Amino acid sequence: MGASGKWVKSIIGLKKLEKDEIEKGNGKNKKWKLWRTTSVDSWKGFRGKHRSDSDGVDSSTVYSAAVATVLRAPPKDFKAVREEWAAIRIQTAFRGFLARRALRALKGIVRLQALVRGRQVRKQAAVTLRCMQALVRVQARVRARRVRMTVEGQAVQKLLDEHRTKSDLLKEVEEGWCDRKGTVDDIKSKLQQRQEGAFKRERALAYALAQKQWRSTTSSNLKTNSSISYLKSQEFDKNSWGWSWLERWMAARPWETRLMDTVDTAATPPPLPHKHLKSPETADVVQVRRNNVTTRVSAKPPPHMLSSSPGYEFNESSGSSSICTSTTPVSGKTGLVSDNSSSQAKKHKPSYMSLTESTKAKRRTNRGLRQSMDEFQFMKNSGMFTGELKTSPSSDPFVSFSKPLGVPTRFEKPRG
C-alpha cells in the first residue's frame, strides 16, 4: 500500500510540473528552443498512452523519433539533439520503473482484495450450508412423522415391534437358561415327579385332617364306637366282602349317615318289654336311594331295645347286619326312608293307593329270600382280618367299609 501511495504522489507531482511549464511558455519572457519543443511534443505524444503500456514501448520507435529529430535539426544544434535524446532515454527508463512499481502495487491490492473477498465468500458459503442442513433436517422430521401416520408406517412399526419382542424373548430364554445335566425328557420327568410329589403331600395332609376330624366326631358317638368294636372283633378278610364298590360307597356316605342317625333317633320307639320285640326279619330297615338305585340296610336293634331289664348288657359278638341292594329305579332326590316313617305315611294315603294283601305277601317272601341269600353270601365270603379295609383303584378314595354301616369313613389307596 505504501508503494501505491508514492506512485500516486509522483503522478500528481508530474502533473504540477507540466502545468508550470505550460504557464511559463505562455508568458512574454518565453524563449523558444528546439530541444524543448521537441521534448514537449514527444511528452504530449507519450502522455495519452496508458501507464501499463509504458513497459511495452518499442526501442525502435524511440530510435526512429530521435533520428527524425536529428535529421530536421540544423548542424549547429547537434549538441542539443544529443541532450534531448539522452533525456528521452532517461525519462523512458524512469517511466518504466514507475509503471512496474505501480503494477506490483496493483497486484498486491488485487491479491489482498481476493483474500478478503475469499474469506467473506467462504463465511457466506458456510452459513448457507448450515441453513440448508437445518432445512433438510426439518424436512426429514416432517416426512418421518407423515410416514408414521400412514398405514404403511404403522405396518413398519408393527414389524419393528415384532422384531423387538423376538429379541426380548431371546433375552428371556438366555436369562432362563437351564444348567442341569441330562436330556430334556429327563428334566421334564423330574419336574413332573416333583409336581406329583407336592400333590401327594397335599392330599396326605388333607386326608390327615379329615381323619382327625372324623376321630373327634366318632369319639362322641357311642353307637359308632360299639359298631367299630364289633366289626374289629369279627376280623373279616379285607377282600372277601360280597359288596360292590358302589354298594359300599352308598352304604357309607357321611352326608347320609347323619340323616340316618336323625331318622333312627326320631323313629325309634321307647323301650318295650322283651316279649313285644320284633323278629330279626322285621328289624329296623333303612332304604337309601342314590342315583336311582335303592339300597336296603337291615341291622339288629340297638342294645336298649334288646334288653328286658336295666341290668342287661348287649353282646357285641352276637350282633349281625345284612345289606341287600335292589336295582329298582327310583325317581326323585336322594333321601332316607325308614319302615317306621313309611308306616306313618301310609295312614295319610288314600285307600286306592294302598297295597293289597297278595302284594304284601309277595313282598314279604321276596324280602325274606333276599335277606337270607345276602346273609349266606356274606358269611360265605367273610373271614378273619386285621386293620382297615382298602378299596380297589376304581373305587371312591373317600369311602372306607372297615367301619360299620352309617359311619362316615374314608378309603385309603391300595398298598403295593
UniProtKB/Swiss-Prot annotation:
One of its GO terms (cellular component) is nucleus. Residues 116-146 are annotated as: Calmodulin-binding. Residues 294-367, 388-416 are annotated as: Disordered. A motif (Nuclear localization signal) lies at residues 14-21. One of its GO terms (biological process) is cytokinesis, division site positioning. The keyword Cytoplasm applies. Residues 317-328 have a biased composition (Low complexity). It holds the Pfam family IQ. Residues 83-111, 112-134, 135-158 form the IQ domain. It is found in: Nucleus; Nucleus, Nuclear body; Cytoplasm, Cytoskeleton; Cell membrane. InterPro entries: IQ_motif_EF-hand-BS. Its main location: nucleus. Residues 388-397 have a biased composition (Polar residues). Keywords: Calmodulin-binding, Cell membrane, Cytoplasm, Cytoskeleton, Membrane, Nucleus, Repeat. It comes from the Eukaryota. One of its GO terms (molecular function) is calmodulin binding. Belongs to the IQD family. May be involved in cooperative interactions with calmodulins or calmodulin-like proteins. Recruits calmodulin proteins to microtubules, thus being a potential scaffold in cellular signaling and trafficking. May associate with nucleic acids and regulate gene expression at the transcriptional or post-transcriptional level. Binds to multiple calmodulin (CaM) in the presence of Ca(2+) and CaM-like proteins. This is Protein IQ-DOMAIN 6. It comes from Arabidopsis thaliana (Mouse-ear cress).
